[in-house]
Amino acid sequence: MKKLLSIIAISLLLAIELPAQTFSSLWAQVDKASKQDRPKTTLVALRQVESKAVKEKQYGHLIASLFSQILYQQQISADSVSNTIARIQTKATQLRKSDRIASLMFYVAMREMENSNGLKIDSLGLYNAYRGFGKKKEGKSLVAELLADKTIAAQLTRHDAVKDFTPLVLQREGSRYFNHDLISLIASTLDDYEPLIDYYLQSGNRKAACIASARMLGNSIDGYRGDKALVARADSLIALFADLQE
């Protein structure tokens, strides 16, 4: 009888729905396991984040979880990395139709991972899939196409848009000058600042236009060999933004 009562009691306890864990508590578990150098435990916690993010369509948490999983899988077994990459590519492709902004953030993360980790994730294939968002012209950059699409541009240039994708998107240096938008993040990932200059000038954000100009010029200076056109461009930019105090 006591055994039966124990079984019933346990069954009742299991039936009680426990409070759902928050993303903060799940990431705290990830952080704790990581600091204890327990990659397998860290992966378990990251998969819990992934599961919750999929259910709630919280793509910043989802992308951060998936790419973090790759880093820890590399410590345990490189063979498992390919499966996670496949899941990333599949999800990014699915989102192209249902949530293009989220899909773009997958692309940004893929490029970042390739740039920083040397991992091949075929971000080029995803990049090509985005061509033609706006009024496509021969040789037009992806950033220019995104800005040409009014619907997409409105979402990417919205103030504090990066908050929609925390903790994936961390506020970068100078992000406040771009009003923490997403288009500057994409441009930074692609090193494609030229389309931003006209956009920020037209929208009245001259500080952002100045920073975009400086970064574009900085990229051009790499390999500089005394190009007179480059010197002239630098002089014109100095004159254009000479009134800015910061």
Which residues are covered by each model-predicted region?
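Extracytoplasmic/secretory-pathway proteins
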Residues: 23-246
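Positively charged n-region of N-terminal signal peptides that target proteins for export
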Residues: 1-4
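Bacterial N-terminal signal peptides
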Residues: 6-17
